[in-house]
Design a protein with these regions (language model features):
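Membrane-proximal intracellular helices of multi-pass ion channels
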Residues: 1-299
Length: 299
């Protein structure tokens, strides 16, 4: 076991999570300036500081050559997800939104793993920054934080494949470009573009239909859809918007986000044969159609 490589990569994961937490911190600052009752900045400042500090400490273990094989990949994947869930729960605890550690850890793990189970009842009373972070965990987990690490870290070598394979399910968790870092980067670009497209459709489309969904709601709803987890900022979930347009947009994008993203890459690079002969996609469509029909008939 190459422990120095494991510690070094875990340090990078913690640093990345700390930087990602800056987004909900900015949301908290914005809504505080707008006069809304928001969570204290400290709810995010403390975990950000801890993640950046401890991450840098772990990075001191950097070996001369970062060697990652199957065993290291599995350890990094397992410990990485525990760490992000542990530190990701701190904003809930510090803000008092979910004061119980076990409940906060459950909520965060549910978010990062895109499970969508929740311990919350009165969701709408929570601060906007906490709601943003809650939905953002879905978006981060939708493609995997370790895949995100590979995508943004330069010089990710072929050994990174073992990390990506440990995290990404399915038979097509292989390369789509010669370099694994380019593969992860390409998939994340597709993921991000699709998320932005949904945000724009929800924001501007609801103005045409007369519902006028706020930008905040458009963003967090798109995060939840992208991760296919379903965290909402309303007690009645998506029904609270009273909009068939919003429901249909989410249905379509949930289906699109559930597709193996390698297929989108093949379509964009005009590798149509590889895309349309994929047995996984055909099975995915059949399962969806079958259960849609069965559930609809029983409602």
């Amino acid at each position: 076991m190459n422990y120095r490589s494991v510690f070094y990569v875990l340090g990078k994961i913690m640093n990345i999570l700390g930087l990602l937490m800056l987004l909900p911190l900015f949301v908290s600052v914005y809504y505080n300036l707008q006069g809304f009752q928001e969570a204290d900045y400290i709810s995010f400042v403390i975990p950000i500081a801890l993640l950046l500090f401890l991450g840098q400490l772990l990075k001191f273990f950097k070996p001369q050559s970062v060697k990652i094989y199957a065993r290291e990949g599995l350890v990094i994947c397992g410990l990485g997800w525990i760490l992000v869930s542990l530190f990701g729960s701190l904003p809930f605890i510090i803000s008092g939104a979910i004061p119980n550690f076990v409940n906060a850890f459950f909520e965060t793990t549910s978010g990062f793993t895109t499970t969508g189970a929740t311990v919350l009842n009165e969701i709408e009373s929570l601060p906007k920054s906490i709601l943003f972070w809650r939905s953002f965990t879905h978006w981060i987990g939708g493609m995997g934080i370790l895949s995100f690490l590979i995508a943004i870290v330069p010089k990710s070598n072929s050994n990174s494949m073992y990390v990506m394979k440990a995290e990404v399910p399915g038979p097509m968790a292989g390369k789509v470009t010669p370099k694994i870092s380019e593969s992860a980067r390409s998939l994340y670009i597709i993921y991000s573009v699709m998320t932005v497209v949904q945000i724009l459709i929800l924001f501007f489309g609801t103005r045409i239909t007369g519902k006028n969904l706020r930008l905040f709601d458009s963003v967090v709803t798109s995060f939840a859809t992208a991760g296919t987890g379903g965290f909402s900022v309303l007690n009645d979930s998506i029904l609270g918007y009273h909009s068939k347009f919003v429901e249909w947009v989410c249905v379509i994008f949930m289906f699109l986000f559930g597709v193996n993203f390698n297929l989108y890459f093949f379509l964009l690079t005009k590798k149509y044969k590889e895309a349309f002969k994929d047995e996984e996609f055909r099975t995915y469509v059949i399962i969806n159609l079958t259960f849609i029909i069965l559930i609809t008939l029983n409602i």
